[in-house]
């Protein structure tokens, strides 16, 4: 009779989840599953609301990445209005979205994942957390706080507040950038750039200590998907977080699908529902479920592009691409990809702020609804974010579908958990470090479970190993 190991809750992620590891009669890992245990139902209670409220309403899906939902939602509403928003509004939205990328990636890398990198996967859990980092590695801890602070301050300067700004609206943004705020933001960027470069240098110096994790943390063939935009000559694919078209690549580096407009996402993506989790499982239609596994997020975005489009980030991207002959398949390298994206974000914000029309006061297009349906797609920190709305003749929402980055990654996270569990978990004697690795592979995806169910720190943990008759064979307690 099989046995089970249950990790409940998974720590240092956003939201509530657990991991179940099934063992066979010989004590070997047979299967492992990632379960999202919270339910929120945002799609359903949006019904009946005016579509113009959707950016602010869906922004409440998450307190960590509200800007991401603002962007995708506003783009869906732009489609319903059938307007082309002013170019300055596009640039201002892009700046806020990049600031969101910076602050969220900083939270993921410095606060949630750096304890594993600094203290090791087998480190004492009593100190393997952000407070332990503050005590032993104060410079890195301060860098993380400052980088996230800068990202949040840029959001506040543009939108009026750091959490749930109401500045991104259907048709553009509600107010232009002032010369004073432009200068304030520009003055913050040199420090942010220095932190990004310093942290990248440190990470590249320690990555060889984690060769085993690189080889076993979600390292398997899959598709990758993200938005991309063309380079100026149209021959290369460039890093994109706000606009662009969808691209799919296979594990050999072959472009499977390219140039997909946002409103055609349903031609390629479908969603499966499983009984043991509130998180849906999107898959690539042509391969079916569950074979149509694909990944989104920082790793996917860097795999799918030829260049970032900014000087220092392009140098780092060249080094990143040199790590493998094709796409990088290891989810552990999501950490590396986040650092490159933060550097790109800082450089790109500086470029946009120096555009001659960035202070233009024409930042919003007004119209009544001209379509009954709209789709908005953008790149959130964790990956591709999709909002799809339908309205009635009164402009009220009748149907909503939100496919969140963590949802896109659900099949990949489950496969990653199984791979790590099979490599590290030994039923004869449970060790905290074994189980931390199972959690740590989930942290490489930086899942946002509030978002993904349309729903930190060191949390209590009890892991029990039960025998065939339910007898307690071993347990690990934390907290």
Model-predicted segments: where are they?
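Aromatic-rich beta-strand edge motifs centered on tyrosine
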Residues: 390-391
């Amino acid at each position: 009779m099989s046995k089970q190991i249950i990790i409940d809750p998974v720590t240092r992620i956003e939201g509530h989840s657990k991991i179940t590891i099934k063992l066979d009669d010989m004590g070997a890992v047979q299967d492992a599953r990632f379960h999202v245990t919270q339910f929120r139902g945002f799609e359903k209670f949006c019904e009946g609301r005016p579509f113009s409220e959707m950016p602010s309403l869906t922004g409440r899906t998450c307190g960590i990445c509200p800007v991401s939902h603002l962007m995708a939602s506003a783009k869906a509403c732009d489609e319903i209005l059938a307007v082309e928003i002013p170019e300055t509004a596009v640039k201002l939205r892009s700046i806020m979205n990049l600031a969101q990328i910076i602050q969220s990636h900083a939270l993921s890398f410095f606060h949630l994942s750096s304890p594993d990198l600094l203290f090791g996967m087998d480190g004492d859990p009593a100190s393997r957390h952000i407070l332990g980092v503050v005590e032993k590695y104060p410079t890195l801890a301060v860098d993380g706080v400052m980088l996230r602070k800068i990202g949040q301050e840029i959001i506040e300067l543009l939108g009026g507040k750091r959490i749930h700004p109401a500045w991104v609206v259907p048709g553009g943004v509600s107010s232009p950038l002032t010369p004073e705020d432009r200068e304030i933001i520009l003055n913050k960027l040199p420090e942010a750039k220095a932190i990004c470069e310093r942290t990248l240098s440190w990470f590249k110096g320690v990555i060889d200590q984690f060769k085993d994790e690189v080889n076993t943390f979600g390292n398997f063939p899959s598709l990758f998907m993200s938005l991309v935009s063309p380079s100026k000559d149209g021959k290369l694919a460039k890093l994109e977080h706000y606009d662009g078209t969808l691209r799919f690549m296979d594990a050999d580096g072959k472009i499977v699908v390219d140039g997909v407009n946002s409103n055609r996402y349903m031609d390629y993506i479908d969603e499966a529902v499983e009984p043991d989790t509130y998180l849906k499982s999107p898959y690539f239609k042509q391969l079916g479920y569950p074979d149509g596994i694909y990944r989104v997020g920082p790793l996917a975005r860097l795999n799918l592009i030829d260049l970032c489009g900014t000087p220092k980030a392009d140098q780092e991207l060249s080094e990143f691409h040199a790590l493998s002959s094709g796409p990088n398949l290891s989810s552990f390298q999501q950490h590396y990809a986040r650092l490159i994206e933060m550097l790109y974000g800082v450089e790109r914000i500086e470029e946009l702020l120096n555009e001659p029309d960035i202070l233009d006061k024409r930042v919003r297009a007004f119209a009544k609804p001209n379509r009954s349906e709209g789709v908005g797609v953008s790149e959130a920190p964790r990956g591709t974010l999709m909002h799809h709305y339908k309205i009635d003749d009164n402009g009220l929402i009748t149907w909503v579908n939100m496919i969140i980055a963590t949802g896109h990654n659900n099949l990949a996270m489950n496969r990653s958990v199984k791979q790590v569990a099979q490599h590290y978990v030994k039923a004869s004697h449970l060790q905290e470090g074994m189980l931390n690795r199972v959690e740590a592979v989930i942290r490489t995806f930086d899942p946002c479970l509030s978002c993904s169910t349309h729903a930190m720190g060191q949390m209590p943990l009890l892991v029990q190993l039960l025998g065939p008759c339910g007898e307690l064979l071993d347990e690990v307690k934390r907290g």
